[in-house]
Design a protein with these regions (language model features):
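Flexible gly/pro-rich beta->alpha loop and the following alpha-helix that scaffold active-site loops
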Residues: 2-3, 10-75, 87
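Acyltransferase
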Residues: 166-187
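Pocket-forming structural segment of enzyme catalytic cores
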Residues: 65, 74, 81-159, 164-173
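A general structural detector for well-ordered alpha-helical segments in enzyme core domains, enriched
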Residues: 59-63, 94, 177
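Short, low-complexity, intrinsically disordered N-terminal peptides in bacterial proteins
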Residues: 1-2, 187
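Short glycine-rich anion-binding loops that position phosphate/pyrophosphate groups of nucleotides
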Residues: 48-52, 79-81, 167
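Generic recognition of short, well-ordered alpha-helical segments
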Residues: 15-18, 57-58, 78, 137, ...
Length: 187
């Protein structure tokens, strides 16, 4: 399966490429500054990167077009935030800015089963000052894992986003976070 990864000049980009390839994807990396047309098929990946999602407004129309076509979409950190900005949600300063530190996620049985893990807790590595606040009226077509008032994972039809770095060595069972890309998304 092909994947096009949009690189936002982040040092984790090629860690993400390696894990996507290990999952079974053939990955093409494209700088966000060169992103001018959508791939014809495959997975669109918005990787991590610096700044606020609105720093990348120029590419919003392309991403909106991809999302409206229901093409498979994967967002990591900044990619998670860009997805939510395109849904009209706020991206605000986190109450707990975290850079290079582990966060322990509490998993319900549903989330644990979805990841294929028989665990109630899993560590994820975070590098973010910004977050998407938890919602009072969430979209019923999406499932959000929320913790400490922030959306940490979003999944839906042909959609998966993480507000952490699944490709980081600080994320335990990190490949479990990539398996849903083949299991749940339609190509």
């Amino acid at each position: 399966v092909k994947a096009t990864l949009i690189d936002f000049d982040d040092s984790f980009t090629y860690n993400l490429v390696q894990d996507l390839e290990e999952t079974g994807f053939s990955v093409t990396v494209l700088s966000w500054t060169d992103f001018e047309e959508l791939p014809s098929s495959g997975l669109l990946v918005l990787g991590p990167g610096p700044g606020h999602p609105d720093d990348y407004l120029r590419i919003y129309p392309l991403i909106e077009k991809w999302l409206s076509s229901k093409g498979p979409f994967f967002g990591v950190c900044l990619g998670h935030q860009i997805y939510w900005r395109l849904q009209g949600e706020l991206v605000v300063r986190s109450k707990n800015p975290t850079h290079g530190q582990k966060m322990t996620l509490q998993l319900s049985r549903e989330w644990s089963n979805w990841l294929g893990l028989d665990l109630k807790l899993v560590d994820v590595q975070r590098y973010n000052s910004l977050c998407v606040p938890a919602m009072t009226h969430p979209n019923p077509e999406l499932k959000n894992l929320e913790q400490d008032g922030e959306i940490i994972i979003t999944r839906g039809k042909n959609l998966l986003t993480y507000q952490f770095h699944p490709e980081s060595v600080g994320t335990s069972y990190h490949m479990a976070f990539f398996r849903p890309l083949l299991k749940d998304l339609v190509y």
